[in-house]
From Swiss-Prot:
The protein, known as: Large ribosomal subunit protein uL1
Gene: rplA
Biological role: Binds directly to 23S rRNA. The L1 stalk is quite mobile in the ribosome, and is involved in E site tRNA release. Protein L1 is also a translational repressor protein, it controls the translation of the L11 operon by binding to its mRNA.
Organism: Borrelia hermsii (strain HS1 / DAH)
SUPFAM superfamilies in alphabetical order: Ribosomal protein L1
Lineage: Bacteria, Pseudomonadati, Spirochaetota, Spirochaetia, Spirochaetales
CDD domains: Ribosomal_L1
Length: 224
C-alpha cells in the first residue's frame, strides 16, 4: 500500500490542479502518469447544474467499443420472442423466464421487454430495480422493435444517468486504446449528454468535467 501510495502522489504531482486541460492533453497526461500494469478504464465524471425535478438519463452508442459484450435478457411472446432469439438475445421468454428470475436467476446484464409484457415484468421490480435493470422507455428497453434494440445493445449502446446530486459518471475507453479513439468516444458521449439539457434550466448545464483512470488521479477538462 505504501508503494502504491507513493506512486499515486507522484502521479498527482504531475497534474497542475489550477489548470483545465484540453481533452487531448488530459488523455495524454493520464497515460503519462499511469502507474499500474493492468488495462485501466478511462472514466469521465461530470457535475451538472440540475434542479430536484430534473432527470438526465439516456443512452449512447460509442464509436469505439471497449467493453465485453453484455448478456441480453428479453421478455417477449410469440413472434416477438422469435425475433429476439434471431437478433441474438441470450435469454428469451415470458412467464417461464419471469419465474426463473424470481427464483434467483441473475446471469444477465441488460433486460428488454415488449410493452405487453410490462404488467408481469413490473412484478420483478424489487429484483430488477435493485440492479438498475428494470426496462424503461427512456433507455429504449421497452419496445416492439426488438431487432433494432438488440442490435444497438450489441454495438454497445450504454445508458448514462445523473444521480440525485447531479453527478454523472461514464466510461469512455481503456488506457490501451489509441488516444484518438478515446477522444471520439468522449465527444460522442458529450454530444448526446448536451441533448438532455432540461428545457427549463437557466444558466450553465455542465458545471465541471473531470477525467481519470481506474487507479489514477483526476484531471479537470476545459469544458466550454
Amino acid at each position: 500500500m505504501a508503494k502504491s501510495g507513493k506512486k499515486y502522489m507522484q502521479a498527482i504531482s504531475k497534474i497542475d490542479k489550477l489548470k483545465s486541460y484540453s481533452i487531448d492533453d488530459a488523455i495524454s497526461l493520464l497515460k503519462e502518469i499511469k502507474f499500474v500494469k493492468f488495462d485501466e478504464t478511462i472514466d469521465v465524471s461530470i457535475n451538472l447544474n440540475l434542479k430536484k425535478n430534473h432527470t438526465v438519463r439516456d443512452t449512447v452508442v460509442l464509436p469505439n467499443q471497449f467493453m465485453k459484450e453484455k448478456r441480453i435478457l428479453v421478455f417477449a411472446k410469440g413472434d416477438r420472442a422469435q425475433e429476439a432469439k434471431e437478433a441474438g438475445a441470450a435469454y428469451v421468454g415470458d412467464d417461464d423466464l419471469i419465474n426463473k428470475v424470481k427464483g434467483g436467476f441473475s446471469d444477465f446484464d441488460i433486460v428488454v421487454a415488449t410493452p405487453d409484457m410490462m404488467k408481469d415484468v413490473g412484478k420483478l421490480g424489487p429484483i430488477l430495480g435493485k440492479r438498475g435493470l428494470m426496462p424503461n422507455p427512456k433507455t429504449q428497453t421497452i419496445t416492439n422493435d426488438l431487432k433494432g434494440t438488440i442490435a444497438g445493445l450489441k454495438k454497445g449502446r450504454t445508458e448514462f444517468r445523473a444521480n440525485k446530486n447531479g453527478v454523472l459518471n461514464f466510461s469512455v475507453g481503456k488506457s490501451s486504446m489509441d488516444n484518438k479513439k478515446i477522444k471520439e468516444n468522449y465527444d460522442e458521449f458529450i454530444k448526446e449528454l448536451l441533448k438532455r439539457r432540461p428545457s427549463d434550466l437557466k444558466g450553465t448545464f455542465v458545471d465541471s468535467v473531470y477525467i481519470s483512470s481506474t487507479m489514477g488521479p483526476s484531471v479537470k477538462i476545459d469544458f466550454v
